[in-house]
Amino acid sequence: MLNDSAGMAVMSENPSPTLSSDEIPLADIYSFLSENDDVEAFRRWVELSSPADTSRLEPCRWLAQQVAFIDELISEQIDAVLHNKRFQALEASWRGLWFLIDAVVNPENTKIRLLDVSWKDLARDMERAPDFDQSGLFHLIYNEEFGTPGGEPFSVLLGDYYVAHRPYEDHRIDDVFTLQGISRAAAAAFCPFVCSAAPQLFGLDDFDNLGLHINVDEIFRSHDYVRWRSMREHDDSRFLALTLPQVLMREPYQDNRRSRRGLRFNESVAGKDNRKYLWGNACFALGTVLIREFSEVGWFSHIRGVPRDHYGGGLVTQFPTPAYRTDSSRATVKMSTSVTVTDQLERELSDYGMIALCHCFQTQYAVFNNCPSLQIPKVYAKKSATANARISSMLQQILCGSRVAQYIKVIVRDKVGSYTTAESCERFLQNWLDQYTTGRDDLSWEMMARYPLREARVVVDEDPAQPGYYSSLVHLKTHYSVDHLVSELRLTTSLSQIDIGKV
């Protein structure tokens, strides 16, 4: 009816006043809403919203006007619900989980488990535990899986949380202490933990100002970050990773006008900032990259950068990028990230252990160019040793080394009682590692997936104080290089004929 051009012309020439919601008495509105009889409710609505003179209005046009007025009122209420801060956080979490599930190509080798626990409960778990190995998180990821025969070790933990260096308004939790406990549990289970940095970590109220020129080096060198730097210097912080900024989880709802039935709802996202858009945790974007890489090659090294003519590496392709409404061809799209991260800012954030999601200019994609862990790489006298320490602290190296360590633990656990000496155990593990090792440098991606190691050696020693207990030292060199440098990863774990209690 509203599409009738003749009718619209008549209405524009003879506009009729209608009562807004502010002009209707509140008692009459409650009476209308509480009425159970549809006919009586319609009669009351007509009485409340009818103009003073309806003789010049045709019934169909008047009804169309009332339907549009009702749509406007309902749209305002839906906007209020959708843009509520708590509702946005809930919707973003579920949509982030959906993106992870949608990224799974082969359900047989990729499993996703959901643990519904708040950051407050996780912090309380770490505070009440006498030590990290007595916490509930350690029991879930280590005792029930990694440390139990038949259990399936976790490869990575994605936490939909935002952390900072100290408590702030509406967040009275010591994140540093909680992260320290999580890092120790994650290191024991060889399972990195990934969450996001809160804007308060940079002294900001939101990520909108992150795109402005800020001195990252000056921020993290201040006295307020002493505990934060101390946590990053610990070896177990290699199993922590922080992503930023936020990523768009859903395009604004828009009426496609293909049907005249139902509500004509267009979500209103206009404002002085972008808070009405649905932003979510960037750890979900990194999770889709990890799932895609593991589904393709069963390995985690190609999770950064953009390879030529290939949807792989650190390229993020699943998340929405709404087009500008003035562009009917959708050739020009908005960013999928909440703020632009420049090359210089990305390098500065990477130096301080942050994994930045960068929008690819004039495309519908984003990319992780670097994947550092939170650890501060150690500095040695030799430049080669310092470079090796920097590369070994990167998340892709930790993920690859952790995968090998988990396999070694499971293999030895299944061979309990079959080894008479440490040498026989060492020989068995070395033969197993040699199956995935080759010294060739001219390998294709497919061959590197089959032989991911350039060099591997293992040393197994028996603990003289504890018969039946073995400790292993594994040295790994992968084929995947970073900035033309090849790193060596060193893993230490204890092997027991009874159980593994320390890493």
Where are these regions (language model features)?
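Long, charged, glycine-rich C-terminal linkers/tails
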Residues: 90-94, 108-119, 441-463
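Generic, well-ordered alpha-helical scaffold segments in large soluble proteins
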Residues: 45, 73, 77, 93-100, ...
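C-terminal edge-of-domain segments
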Residues: 457-503
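Long, contiguous, structured domain-core segments that constitute the functional module of a protein
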Residues: 263-428, 437, 480, 484-489
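Long, charge-patterned amphipathic interaction tracts in eukaryotic proteins
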Residues: 92-165
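Extended, regular secondary-structure scaffolds
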Residues: 146-334
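N-terminal-proximal low-complexity accessory segments that begin disordered
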Residues: 2-120, 127
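Short, hydrophobic/π-rich interface segment
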Residues: 424-449
